[in-house]
Amino acid sequence: MSDVFDIIRFNDQGLVTAIAQQHDTGEVLMLAWMNREAIEETLATGRVCYFSRSRNGLWRKGETSGQVQTLIELRVDCDGDALLVLVDQPGVACHTGRRSCFYRAMGKDGTVTTLTEPLIDPHTLYGS
């Protein structure tokens, strides 16, 4: 059995793409980034931690909003440059108050349709 860090290929900034997916439904929830420290914390605690590029630091999912992701399984793709984070996400995953960050669909003609409305007011999640 290999060590996970032997197969993950981090980019020049020490980050790897992480796709969060609801473990029991297959719903794609969000895309984020992880560094080694975020992966180590996630594996150690079972609570998903990402790396925030805008804040340049660890982002413990749900720390502010209460919308915690619990790790079910961590998978590495064939090239080692992307992670699939299978999670249990009871509430919303998106900062817009939606279940998934992928709530817009683009038609072949380029028009964009909003598929879902917010389930929670973002101000309720994060304050004003």
From Swiss-Prot:
Belongs to the PRA-CH family. It comes from Granulibacter bethesdensis (strain ATCC BAA-1260 / CGDNIH1). One of its GO terms (molecular function) is magnesium ion binding. GO terms for biological process: L-histidine biosynthetic process. Its cofactor is Mg(2+); Zn(2+). NCBIfam families: PRK00051.1. Its EC number is 3.5.4.19. Homodimer. PANTHER family: HISTIDINE BIOSYNTHESIS BIFUNCTIONAL PROTEIN, HISTIDINE BIOSYNTHESIS BIFUNCTIONAL PROTEIN HIS7. One of its GO terms (cellular component) is cytoplasm. It comes from the Bacteria. The keyword Transport does not apply. Binds 1 Mg(2+) ion per subunit. Binds 1 zinc ion per subunit. This is Phosphoribosyl-AMP cyclohydrolase. Mg(2+) binds at D77, D79, D81.
